[in-house]
Amino acid sequence: PPFLEGRKYPEMTLSTKLGNHRLVAKYDLILVQDDNLIIFDWKTSRKQPRKAWLLDRVQTRLYRLILTQAGSSLTSMGEMRPEQVSMNYWFTANPSALVSLPYSEKTYLKDITFFEEIAQEILDRKEENFYRTNDLNKCRYCVYRSHCDRGVEAGDLETFDSFGVDEEDFELDLDFDEIQELEF
């Protein structure tokens, strides 16, 4: 996104501990602005999901949690409060439509519980209970498909029509006259 004021950290990888587990995130851009840390994640999809759907995404929850815990390494402010962290999704198909998702202490605590429960569920599961999907169409786009002997590299997501999400979860309110051309 153009005209961002503050210190910029592009392609930044941060990690933090959650219990006995390490969480890692690679951010498109972290912007340090005054006392705040702002995540920018750009998406190239043609359809823009609803804000509620973005808020519930694992990516949103994980990125904000990790930045809250590890973001002090980017500033001289000391420990970060969740209210100092926000995440912005920027859709290249509609550059003026930035979706901003602020964070809160209440949501932060819910996210910690959510990821602790996922980690425990993984630990509790026996190896034979990690099953492969029967839907081979999903495998075509999975970056881990080689681990299951279902191909070597994932397919192009631009050709994938559905992520199992209802169409009404997406908004497509574009005015093509307002969209600037992107230079390469």
Model-derived regions: residue spans:
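A non-catalytic, helix-rich entry segment at domain boundaries
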Residues: 1-10
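Mg2+/Mn2+-dependent nuclease catalytic core
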Residues: 12-117
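Polybasic (Lys/Arg-rich)
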Residues: 106-143
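Basic, low-complexity terminal or inter-domain segments flanking catalytic cores
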Residues: 126-132, 152-155, 160
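Cys/His-rich metal-chelating microdomains
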Residues: 145, 151
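Acidic, low-complexity intrinsically disordered tails
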Residues: 156-184
